[in-house]
């Protein structure tokens, strides 16, 4: 069960980070460059 909880938490954080990067592309340009999965 712990593995599923960790996966859910990681996926939720990833979705939040993705939405934040998409909404604030200009402000988080430095974060979007190293990640490189925005587009």
From Swiss-Prot:
It is found in: Secreted. Expressed by the venom secretory cell of the spine. The spine is a cuticular structure containing a single large nucleated venom-secreting cell at its base. It is an independent unit capable of producing, storing and injecting venom. On the back of A.stimulea caterpillars, spines are grouped together by 50 to 100 to form scoli, of which there are eight. GO terms for cellular component: extracellular region. The modification Phenylalanine amide is found at residue 37. Keywords: Amidation, G-protein coupled receptor impairing toxin, Secreted, Signal, Toxin. Its main location: secreted. Residues 1-23 form the signal peptide. GO terms for molecular function: toxin activity. Negative results: has no effect on human neuropeptide FF receptor 2 (NPFFR2) and kisspeptin receptor 1 (KISS1R). Has mild effect on ASIC1a channels (31% inhibition at 10 uM) and no effect on ASIC1b channels. Strongly activates (at 30 uM) the human neuropeptide FF receptor 1 (NPFF1R), a G-protein coupled receptor, with an effect that is equipotent to the endogenous RFRP-1 ligand in activating NPFFR1. Is toxic when injected into Drosophila melanogaster. Also shows a moderate anthelmintic activity against the parasitic nematode H.contortus (drug susceptible Kirby isolate) (IC(50)=20.1 uM). Belongs to the FARP (FMRFamide related peptide) family. This is U-limacoditoxin(13)-As54. It comes from Acharia stimulea (Saddleback caterpillar moth). The lineage of its organism: Eukaryota, Metazoa, Ecdysozoa, Arthropoda, Hexapoda.
């Amino acid at each position: 069960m712990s593995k599923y909880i960790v996966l859910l938490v990681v996926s939720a954080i990833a979705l939040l980070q993705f939405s934040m990067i998409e909404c604030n592309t200009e402000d988080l340009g430095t974060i979007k460059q190293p990640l490189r999965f925005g587009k």
